[in-house]
Amino acid sequence: MPHAKFSRVKITEPVLTASEYSLRTSSYIERWQKQHGKRLDHDERVRKRQARESHKQSQDAQNLRGLRAKLYQQKRHAEKIQMRKRIKAQEEKNVKSSAPDEPSKTPLPQYLLDRSQATNAKALSSAIKDKRAEKAAKFAVPLPKVKGISEEEMFKVVNTGKKTHKKSWKRMITKPTFVGSDFTRRPVKYERFIRPMGLRYKKANVTHPELGVTVQLPILGVKKNPQNPLYTQLGVLTKGTIIEVNVSELGLVTTSGKVVWGKYAQITNTPENDGTVNAVLLV
């Protein structure tokens, strides 16, 4: 008896899109929970897992190294930005509007008139903003931004050592500096930063912006160097540095009639190139 020939039938799977595939594969947990229910301690386990999250984040932030640390910090940075935005939106939502949509037509008694339009929060917020703007204008400087200076440009390595000269922990400052009259040098063996005598300045050519006069005034100190707090401590004079000068020669007085002795000024030139310190008085 001849064998019967059977034709093969090819069964094809239905073609799924990426979204349908992800939905079908990602909802298996929910499907299983609907069929069989949850553990009795499921909620407690979830609560404890969430409580441990902050500890794990702290541990990762301290212990991750290299590229993983960089990626983790970027992720945390984005999360914090979103959190701040949500908090800010919530705070703005809670602030009562200064202008109500429609004034109430029903008359109010005398003791409730001050509560009809709650503008306290808005008024307080605007007052704080105005104060900040005034403060920013008060401390505005002629040069708000300056070019950065690298440590290689600022410091020159000084090799020391009795015979080998292999020790290189000392640094010589290559920029002009201000050293106060009461400064006492440390013993040479322990002096880390060397400020050459030829680059020390004691006077500055200060211009008064309103009077339009330039006077040579003694420098009292360095208030802030925009490059680095260390440069402020060392008294380095670079472009944009805020210095304190003795303005008693100008005869400036306060509203109460007292003579102004010290005032801040900002260096506007490059002292290492010009050989002199030019500054504008901050009034």
From Swiss-Prot:
Motif extent (Nuclear localization signal 2): 74-81
The UniProt record lists the keyword Nucleus: yes
Region (Disordered): 31-109
Species in which this protein is naturally found: Aspergillus fumigatus (strain ATCC MYA-4609 / CBS 101355 / FGSC A1100 / Af293) (Neosartorya fumigata)
Domain of life: Eukaryota
CDD domains according to UniProt: NSA2
Bias (Basic and acidic residues): 38-58
Official protein name in the record: Ribosome biogenesis protein nsa2
PANTHER family named among the record's database cross-references: RIBOSOME BIOGENESIS PROTEIN NSA2 HOMOLOG
GO cellular component entries: nucleolus; preribosome, large subunit precursor
Oligomeric and partner information: Component of the pre-66S ribosomal particle. Interacts with nop7 and rrp1. Interacts with rsa4 (via WD repeats).
Protein localization: Nucleus, Nucleolus
Function recorded in the entry: Involved in the biogenesis of the 60S ribosomal subunit. May play a part in the quality control of pre-60S particles.
Pfam families from the UniProt entry: Ribosomal_S8e
GO-annotated biological processes: maturation of 5.8S rRNA; maturation of LSU-rRNA
Record key words, sorted: Nucleus, Ribonucleoprotein, Ribosome biogenesis, rRNA processing
Gene this chain is encoded by: nsa2
Chain intervals with Basic residues compositional bias: 73-87
